[in-house]
A protein has these predicted regions:
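Residues at the starts of beta-strands that form the adenosine-phosphate
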Residues: 5-7, 63-65, 89, 117, ...
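A structural signal for short hydrophobic beta-strand segments in well-ordered beta-sheet cores
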Residues: 28, 163-165, 237
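N-terminal glycine-rich phosphate-binding loop and ensuing alpha1 helix
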Residues: 2-76
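Conserved beta-loop-beta/alpha segment of the NTase-like Rossmann-fold superfamily
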Residues: 76-78, 84-167
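A conserved hydrophobic position in a structured secondary element of the catalytic/binding core
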Residues: 71, 128, 191-192, 249
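Catalytic-core segments of class I nucleotidyltransferases/pyrophosphorylases
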Residues: 141, 170-245, 252-262
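Short, well-ordered beta-strand micro-motif
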Residues: 30, 164, 191-193, 247
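Short beta->alpha linker loops
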Residues: 71, 96, 131, 155, ...
């Protein structure tokens, strides 16, 4: 696969209703700590949850990051600023109305040349291994895939998009938040190339031109995964057997993350 520019996209425009009321965006909740230099001395300081994602993107070597924000999310801009502290240029795109993650991702399209490779993760999640994006990118390039999903085990399939693979790591099944299922892998992070980006844009364009846009249901990334499978795109899954994935979207999950990273 021809090497292209690798960028990161962080969708952070959601309202975080499950943790409301809270005076800060959920992406800015403190989980764990970081070591910083203060007057020549190393000191511990709180670490916000979205910083784990930014650092994982940095490990993968992305050249720039786009963070899509919405109303009430300007604390994110104030915290990360231009990305200088992380060695990566960070730009922000404003989404006035949260319509679903795919729409947030598609807002980045006008700012791209159309040949980039994208790494994407959710800023209210923490996952291991730390180099998961780096390994996902390597697999994506080796497989010459259109979309490659990073997969993690879970005992709570009803909270995630669940993925089935064949022996060649091809994605052959996707079910969103099933109450019961034989599937054991959730998709947590993603890597894609130009063909998938074009497909997502065309799917959203088609939905917007009809009055039956999911009959009021929010369009989710899983809808685009399904569209890619139906279109015959090369969709792969990379399982992280020893990894873990925490979505801090509820109080219990936030408590688990705080205890794990204290």
């Amino acid at each position: 696969m021809r090497v292209t520019e690798v960028i990161g996209i962080v969708p952070a425009a959601g309202k975080g209703k499950r943790l409301a009321p809270y005076p800060l965006p959920k992406e800015m909740l403190p989980v764990g700590y970081q070591i910083i230099e203060v007057n020549g001395q190393s000191q511990k300081r709180p670490k916000v949850v979205s910083q784990y994602l930014i650092e994982a993107l940095a490990i993968a070597g992305v050249s720039r990051i786009f963070i899509v924000i919405g109303p009430g999310k300007f604390d994110i801009v104030e915290y990360y600023r231009n990305g200088e502290d992380y060695g990566i240029p960070i730009a922000y795109i404003f989404q006035p109305e949260a319509k679903g993650m795919p729409y947030a991702l598609d807002l980045v399209t006008p700012w791209l040349k159309g040949c980039e490779t994208v790494l994407m993760g959710m800023p209210d999640t923490i996952f291991e291994p730390r180099d998961a994006f780096q390994r996902l990118l390597s697999a994506h390039q080796a497989w010459e895939a259109d979309l490659t999903l990073g997969l993690f085990k879970t005992n709570f399939p009803q909270k995630f998009g669940m993925i089935g693979l064949d022996q060649e790591y091809n994605v052959i099944e996707h079910i969103d938040k099933p109450q019961t299922t034989h599937l054991k892998w959730l998709w947590g992070i993603a890597c894609w190339g130009p063909r998938f980006m074009v497909l997502m844009h065309e799917v959203l364009k088609a939905l917007s031109s009809t009055s039956a846009e999911r009959k009021g249901r929010e369009v989710i990334f899983g809808d685009i995964i399904d569209a890619a499978l139906n279109a015959g795109l090369r969709v792969k899954g990379l399982p992280f057997e020893e990894g873990h994935y925490i979505d801090i979207g509820t109080y219990e999950d936030l408590k688990q993350a705080i205890l794990l990273y204290i």
